[in-house]
Every structure is written in structure tokens, then in C-alpha cells.
Amino acid sequence: MAKSSLLSGFFCFLVLFHCSVAYSGRQQREQQGQRGQRQQGECQLNNLNAQEPQHRIQAEAGVTEFWDYNDDQFQCAGVAACRHIIQPRGLFLPTYTNAPHLIYIVQGRGFQGVMMSGCPETFQSSQQSEGGGGRREGAGQRFRDQHQKIRHFREGDVIAIPAGVAHWCYNDGDSELVVVTVEDLGNNQNQLDNNPRKFFLAGNPRQQGQGQQQQQREFHRRGGREEHNFGNVFSGFDTEVLAEAFGVDREMARKLQGQDDNRGHIIRVEGDLQVLRPPRSREEQEQQERGSEYHANGLEETICSARLHENINDPSRADIFNPRAGRLTTVNGFNLPILNFLRLSAERGVLYRNAMMAPLWKINAHAVLYATRGEAQVQIVDHRGQSVFNDRIREGQLVVIPQNFVVTKQAGNEGFEWVAFTTHENAMFSTLAGRTSALRAMPVDVLANAYQMSRDEARRLKLSKEETVMMESRSRSGRRDVA
């Protein structure tokens, strides 16, 4: 009897375990398959191009430039890209998007607010910290501001923003702030179509685009699907509804709608922006200490306390380094856990003069490469063995490298630096040459038969390079050997 009960319990456990594994596997396949289903039939790429931004929208204190997301390479990867140039004391108005995105700080510094729904307002002022800036709310009372966390950022930071999360940023430096953003429209967090959408919570961004209407009409005649146009969501509501919802008068409700605001989506702040924020030096020191010692256990972060940015500009934190060729630094779900939720990652590469990056392919992700300095000769080859890109890419240009397409880069005389945004939280690659390459892992006889060469030739091919990913130029090493 006991044996029968034990056997029945064992079978019940097997059934429950099988159902749990099946459900988990189905859920994972649904998440991973959503991108493939959306882009099915859209990756027949015969030619890739290094592109400059195609459209620009001017505002009072800056400009936003857009790459043409209707281009085949962007449609294949399911991404959209733009570049913001924000002047000193420029405030990028609060907005949210329909897809998660990564931001890379190319130049400058500033601070930002990210409004996580339901999270507490942990930054609170006191009467002492207000000084003379607080305004009185009745006799003997001083207004004490409180808001969600303010985060500093600087050149080299990668910032992660989930879909539908409102955020703003401010340039508190003395030079222009240059920011590149890539949205992952094929992500499972985007339940709309593959058109990027920005929902602004202030101003009158639509007004700024009136000067570009002729350009937009021409763009539509060429087959573009949607304008790079956006507006203040409050402007669509009746004034009475807003007045009732916020408990204010109609005049203040009209200010929410920005009806008379012609400054655009990046506005200039008079004086300086007064917000509660920690000293920059203290926050940067904490980030550096956390970056060198951080070991996540998967339990210590909630959505309200999650780290949203990581700096990948520090040479001492490189993941791959060759003192004669260059370095590669990655940020992924291991060192920035929020990326496991966004299913995105990024890398920053530096190639020294004439150095080469080994031919490789991304195993599980598309890559969007943006050149930040210098130039390089880049070649990309597809599954048919045909070159779909063989050209130089220069600073400010962008190219999409589809999943599994093989790519190699060789820096010019001034070197080459780039940042690549990848559509997987832990993007992996495999090389074709070097000590950790696919060819190095094959038996000599397999190489000899596959390439119709002798075993000695196959052995030389297999052992020809001891470098891994970053490779020194043969011409440079040859000159050093002669010397």
C-alpha cells in the first residue's frame, strides 16, 4: 500500500515537473519568437549602407536627428535610431516610448530623472536645503519638494530605459551633450507595430515640425510609413477634463497642454535647473567602486532601486585587451541586471592604428554599430558567401550587422572607436580566426580535407594566430621585427 502511494506520488511529481518545464519553455520560445515572427521575410539584404541621419527636428536648445527606420537594414533588425544634440542648460522634456531603448553618451555630461510607476519619492528637501529657493504655502509654511531619484551621467555611459517609462534629461555641462539612442521595436515589450513612437508629457513638440512638413510629404511619397512626429499627450484631452483630473483651473490646464509653447522638445532653462541630487563626485566614486566589486546575486535589485547605467569608457574595465591592437568592453545582463528585463546589451570597441578585429559573427543578436571616432574598413558577408557591405565607416555613421552575418573591421591611420547596441541581453559571438576561433577548435584532418590542403598547411592555418579578437596589423608587426 505504501509502495503504491509512493509510486503514485512520484508519477504526479513527474507530470507536474513536465508541465512546468513545458510551460516555461513555451513562454521563453514565445518571447524569443516574437522578434522572428515580426521580421519574417524582411531580412533579404543584398546591400548594407553606412548611413548618416536622414531627418532632423530643431528645437530651442538642441536638435534631434533620425536615421531612416524604413530602410531595409533597420526593418530587418527591428530597430530605430536617433541622435540628440542638447546645448548647455538644455532640458529634454519628459517623454516615454513604445519600445525599450539603450542610450549611449557620446559627449558631455548631465543628469536625468526616470519616473518608475509606483516607486517612492526618495529625494526630499528640507527647509535648510531649500535656502531662499523654497516658496511659502501659507503662513509659516515652506514648500518641501520631493521626487524620484536623480541620476548623473557622463561620457561613455550606457543608459537603459524600459518601454513606457517616462524620463527627462538636462545638460548641466559647458559643452554640447551628444546622445545616441537605439530603440528595439521588435522587443516583446512593444505590443504595437514597428513604428517608433514618442509620447511627450510637456511642451508642444508638434509645433517645431511645421518647418519640415514639405520634407515629410516628400518622404511619404517615397514610401515612408510614418512621420518622425510627436506631440504632447495632454493636448488631446479636453481642458475641462484636465482641470478636473488635476484639481486646477482651466488656465493651468491649458499650460499643461502647451498650446502657446513654441520651444519644441528641447527647451532652454533660464539660470540653472534646481533639483535635489547628490554631488557628482560622490556618485561617480560610488559607481567606480561598485563597478570593480559588483557581483549580482539576482535578489538585491527591485525595479525601484535598479541600476540603469554603466560606464564602458574606462580602459581598465575592458573585457578583451591587446596592448598592440585595442580593447573591447561589454555591458550585459551580468553586470547591469536591468538588461535581462530589456533583453538588450551593448559593447564599446577601440582599435588602434591599422589594427584589425578578427572575422566574427553574433550568435544570438543583431548589432547596430555607431562610429564614435576615426574610421575603419568594414566588410560584412551573408549566408550566400556574398559581400553585402565593403566600405569605410566614419565618425557619426551607423550600420546594422544582422545576426550570423560575418563582419571584420580594420582601423585606419587614426584608429577606430565604436559602440554597438545588440538585441539580446547576453549577446555572444564566435570568431573565424585566432586562438579561440571555430577553425582552431577543429581537428587538423578536418581542415585538410575541407580546404584541400596538406596536413602541414592545415596545421599552420590552425596555429597561425595566437591573438583572440583584436589583432595587430601585419605591416606594423613586420616593421617592428625588421627594426
Model-derived features with residue positions:
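An N-terminus-focused feature that recognizes amino-terminal "leader" regions
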Residues: 2-334, 345-348, 358-364, 420-422, ...
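C-terminal, well-structured subdomains that either form a transmembrane helix-short loop-helix hairpin
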Residues: 95, 333-335, 339-421
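Short, glycine/serine-rich, charged loops/turns that create anion-binding
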Residues: 186, 375, 425
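Short active-site-adjacent structural elements
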Residues: 409, 427-430
